[in-house]
Amino acid sequence: MAEVVPAAKRERHHAGEFLHGYRVRKWLGDGAFSVVYLVEDPKTHVQYALKHVISEGEKEDRYLDQLRMEWEAGRKLKHPNIRDIVDLRGDQTFGFIKKPGKDLGLVMEMIDAPSLEDLLLKNEPRFSIAQWISIFRDVASAFVHIHEKGFAHADMKPNNILWDRDHTKVIDFGQAWKIGTKKPRMSGTAGYVAPEQPLIDVITAQTDVFNFGATMYRLLRGKFAPQAVQKGYPRDFQLAEDVIGESTPLTQWNPEIPERLSDLVLNCLELEPSRRKYMTFVLKQLESMQPVSVK
C-alpha cells in the first residue's frame, strides 16, 4: 500500500495554472491532506477558495470521503454566519452511474479574515464582553441552522471561526456528520473534544454544544476547559470526574463576565450529553444577554 504523503510535501499548483476549471491566483495554505488556493472563475472573474485533495492510495481515500461529506453538508447550509460551499469538482456522473474521482476540488466562498485562534495567539484585538457575546450569538445561530439540517459540525474550535468587524463565519465542515449516526473515526481537536467523541459514539447535536462550550471557555479564559478531552486520552476511557477535570466559574476569573454567561458555558461543558442544553436554548440565552448588536 502506498505511503500517505502529506499535502504540504506535494507539488503545488502555481499562479496562472488551471485547477478544476478555475485559474489559480495564489496558494493560501495547507491542511493535513489538502491544499487551499485562491482561484478565479475565468468567465465571471469571481474569486473563491478551492480546497484540493488528491488520493494516491487506499489509505488516502478517506480524505476524499471527508471532502464529499463537507460538500454534502455545506451545500444544504445557507446562513449568513456559515461559509458558502459553491461546488465540488472531480467526481463524474454518467446517467445514473457515479464514478468517484481521485482528485477533488471543493469550491468555497473566499473570506479574507483571520480566525479567532489567530487573534487569540496575537492577543489582539482585546474584545469587550459585549463583543464576545455578539460573536458567540452569531456562532450559535449558525449551529441552530446546521442542526436543523440534520448535521453536526463535530470540530468547533476558535480556528474554525473567522471574524472581521462586520462578519462572523463558521468554516470547515471536513469532520461534519449526520446527527444520529455513528462516525467510523474519532473527530475533533484536542482541547475541544467532548468526552463521548473518543468513544466513537453516535454523533448528536449535544456534541457540538460541548465543542462550542469549550471554544467559549478558551476564548474568555485564555485556557482550555479542563472537561475537554486532551491529547493522549485512550479511546476506551470512562466518563468520570476523577479522569476529566471541572471548570471553575468564569466569574471567579473575570468579574466582568455575566454570571448567566458563565453558567451557560459550564452547562455546555457538562460531561453527560443529556445534561447539556440544546443549541436553540444557548442561542436564546445569548440573545437575551445582548439585545443590541455590538461589533
Predicted feature locations:
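Protein kinase glycine-rich loop
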Residues: R25-G31, V36
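AlphaC helix of the eukaryotic protein kinase fold
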Residues: E58-K76
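Conserved short submotifs of the Hanks-type protein kinase catalytic core
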Residues: I97-S115
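Activation segment signature within eukaryotic-like protein kinase domains
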Residues: I135-F136
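Conserved catalytic-loop aspartate of Hanks-type protein kinases
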Residues: D208
